[in-house]
Amino acid sequence: MGRFIFVSFGLLVVFLSLSGIGADQECLPGWSFYEGHCYKVFDEYKNWTDAEQYCTEQENGGHLVSFHNREEVDFVVKLGYTILKADIVWIGLRDFWRECHWGWSNGAQLDYKGWNDEPNCFIAYTVGNKWLRRKCSSTQQFVCKSPA
């Protein structure tokens, strides 16, 4: 009887782990889940256009990260600094037409702002939550975001 219970419990544990119960199965391995999206920090240096293209070519698609509230920024800041030990990453904000028509690379509405007045692409300092405009041709590490 005891062996039957032990085997049954063992099979239950295996079943639950394979079904994703209690595990973070919303994102691909190496990606982190937050509020319906998956995020991944890339420790590679690319210009803004190449970083955005790299994000769209990932298995789960996506774009450079867009922010819609302070809590999302805090999540990405913690994720970025933990992985990179650096404090600057590309984000998906850019003046696409160079006429101050700002928009996220994924088409989302710009509803949260934090920057100064310089070139047409944006970096985020992962410490201090400052957004700065930077030449799109410069290279930085970056964070991709995709729907879960």
Curated annotation (Swiss-Prot):
Tell me yes or no: is Secreted among this UniProt entry's keywords: yes
Q: Which residues are glycosylated?
A: N47
Q: Which CDD domains match?
A: CLECT
Please indicate the residue ranges that the annotation assigns to the motif Mannose-binding.
Answer: 118-120
Cited InterPro entries: C-type_lectin-like (IPR001304), C-type_lectin-like/link_sf (IPR016186), C-type_lectin/snaclec_domain (IPR050111), C-type_lectin_CS (IPR018378), CTDL_fold (IPR016187)
MF-aspect GO terms:
carbohydrate binding; toxin activity
| Expression sites (tissue/organ) | Expressed by the venom gland.
Does the entry annotate any disulfide bonds, and if so which pairs? C27-C38, C55-C144, C121-C136
Q: Which PROSITE patterns does this entry report, sorted A to Z? A: C_TYPE_LECTIN_1, C_TYPE_LECTIN_2
Signal peptide residue numbers: 1-23
Please report the stretch or stretches of sequence annotated as the C-type lectin domain: 34-145
Could you describe the subunit structure of this protein?
A: Homodimer; disulfide-linked.
Tell me which PANTHER family the record gives.
MANNOSE, PHOSPHOLIPASE, LECTIN RECEPTOR RELATED (PTHR22803)
What family does this belong to?
A: Belongs to the true venom lectin family.
Q: What is this protein called?
A: C-type lectin 2
**Which organism's genome codes for this protein?**
Bitis arietans
